[in-house]
Amino acid sequence: YFKSCSQYIYPLPVERTDNKQVFYNIAILDDAIRKKKKVLFEYAEYHTDKKMHLKKREDGSVREYIITPYQMAVQEGKYYLICNYDKYDDISNYRVDRIRNIQILEEKGKPFETLKWSGHQPMNLNEYMKEHVYMYSSENAFVKFRIVKAMISDVIDLFGKGVNFSEETDTHVSVSVHVNERAAEQFAKNYAPDVVILQPKRLRDKLRDDLKKAWEAYED
């Protein structure tokens, strides 16, 4: 049954989840994607009591999400929904295991080609996954890193062989890649100081400020 309802998951998971909520959500989303329909759901998050709670608005009412689903993806053992949140003109990613009370709507979904950053092209999932290695939702950009050469394999594993190398020395090399900005930022934070963002300047400046704040937080 799972296989018949998972044609929109990429890549297919090696280990299958035993979470009944996830199975149910996948089946509903698969059906909605096939029918090109919007869905409505509620979304849960952890609180300090270590239990899941539905996200709420400021007035205390439960927040409802109306989205157009395009694809599901597995990243680091977690299932993600790639979709368009109806209020906006871009892509959002949601954890499938945190979706609650999902239902398919009669309204037709928003075609991917009409979204900002789509280039009026159908969704290329391989490219999307390369650009969104941490499944963040933000604008894509051409990012240039300076890395230690020991990181080359990690860079290719993470971003694929579409990266460009330049300015190579015995110890360092520059890397240029078209990638999701938040993913680039997280990558640089994870591997600092072995990875340094060179361009774009706004991202370099933001990372420098964030790392400075992190350093100050550890000062006595």
Predicted regions mapped to residue ranges:
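Well-ordered beta-strand positions in beta-sheet-rich domains
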Residues: 64-66, 93-96, 144, 174-176
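A structural signal for short hydrophobic beta-strand segments in well-ordered beta-sheet cores
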Residues: 72, 102, 165-166
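Flexible linker/loop signature enriched in Pro/Ser/Thr and Pro/Gly
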Residues: 88-125
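Bulky hydrophobic/aromatic content
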Residues: 1-52
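Polybasic (Lys/Arg-rich)
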Residues: 122-220
